């Protein structure tokens, strides 16, 4: 059974010591509460797993066991990325992450034998989708201890050592290990130096590999630098134009750069649920004009950009 302190064996020079340093109460005051939730999960034997739009594990169990599973997993609230289903328990997450995957899966194609890095991976949902597409292994990193622990709760049912979620920040990674596919989904606009983030994405991509960047964008020609909050988020430094995203990817070294999707985010895709009870997108939009945020900026639109590393 995979546990919190399991680490990949093929990441030389990575700061893997940080895993044990961060999986402790002194690093995050809620750690023991979250860990006890995972440890309280019944030792139910999961059946076959399906890595589709909903990540599923067949879990034959009685109603009492199912209720215990639900109570334990709800102690790991909020659940952002998904959906997941364990037996008859459906985890309706804030994001319909399957919609985002659908927008890029044709461009990604067959990932057979590829190693994938997912920066800002959350609980690892996209890692399961990459495995479905044939990936050999997925390494996800996310600074949120809660999201990492959610992943290990999921692993209690899936128990698949090909998908990792580690509590490491992107800027802490050396360039000594490179990947066939690097993903950065929903990270760029939180970076004070967006070009530097894309340069790191490039450095972590193998020659012949691809980088995929998903970010908030504006459809205007000029990038947006919010003053104060954007859609209630206080750490959005730049919402680039699509042209700016392409230019940054090219400056970082990627070629054959293209925008493969541009889609406005709607409250059908991002919303409050039983598993994410905080406010969500609908509370961030102008009540009288949903094409604007409550601060008066253009409402969220997201683009997916892909480029190749040829040298």
Where are these regions (language model features)?
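A short SAM/SAH-binding and catalytic strip from SAM-dependent methyltransferases
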Residues: 180-194
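A short glycine-rich, Lys/Arg-flanked "PGG" loop and its adjoining helix->strand segment in the class I
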Residues: 195-210
């Amino acid at each position: 059974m995979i546990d919190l302190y399991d680490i990949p064996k093929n990441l030389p020079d990575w700061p893997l010591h940080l895993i044990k340093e961060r999986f402790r109460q002194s690093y995050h005051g809620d750690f023991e509460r979250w860990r006890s939730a995972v440890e309280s999960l019944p030792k139910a034997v999961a059946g076959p797993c399906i890595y589709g739009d909903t990540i599923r594990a067949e879990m034959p169990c009685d109603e009492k066991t199912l209720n215990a599973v639900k109570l334990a997993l709800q102690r790991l609230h909020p659940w952002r990325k998904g959906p997941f289903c364990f037996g008859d328990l459906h985890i309706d997450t804030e994001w319909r992450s399957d919609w985002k995957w659908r927008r890029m899966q044709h461009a990604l194609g067959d990932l057979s034998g590829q190693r994938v890095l997912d920066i800002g991976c959350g609980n690892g949902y996209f890692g399961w989708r990459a495995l479905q597409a044939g990936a050999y292994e997925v390494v996800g990193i996310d600074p949120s201890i809660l999201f990492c622990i959610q992943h290990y709760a999921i692993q209690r049912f899936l128990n698949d050592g090909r998908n990792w979620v580690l509590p490491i920040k992107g800027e802490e990674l050396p360039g000594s290990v490179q990947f066939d596919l690097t993903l950065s989904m929903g990270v760029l606009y939180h970076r004070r130096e967006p070009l530097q983030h894309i340069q790191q994405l490039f450095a972590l991509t193998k020659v012949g590999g691809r980088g995929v960047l998903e970010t908030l964008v504006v459809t205007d020609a000029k990038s947006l630098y919010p003053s104060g909050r954007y859609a209630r988020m206080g750490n959005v430094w730049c919402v680039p134009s699509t042209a700016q995203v392409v230019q940054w990817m090219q400056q970082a070294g990627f070629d054959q750069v293209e925008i493969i999707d541009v889609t406005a985010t709607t409250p059908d895709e991002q919303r409050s649920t039983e598993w994410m009870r905080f406010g969500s997108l609908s509370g961030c939009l102008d009540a009288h004009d949903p094409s604007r945020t409550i601060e008066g900026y253009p409402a969220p639109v997201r683009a997916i950009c892909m480029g190749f590393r040829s040298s």
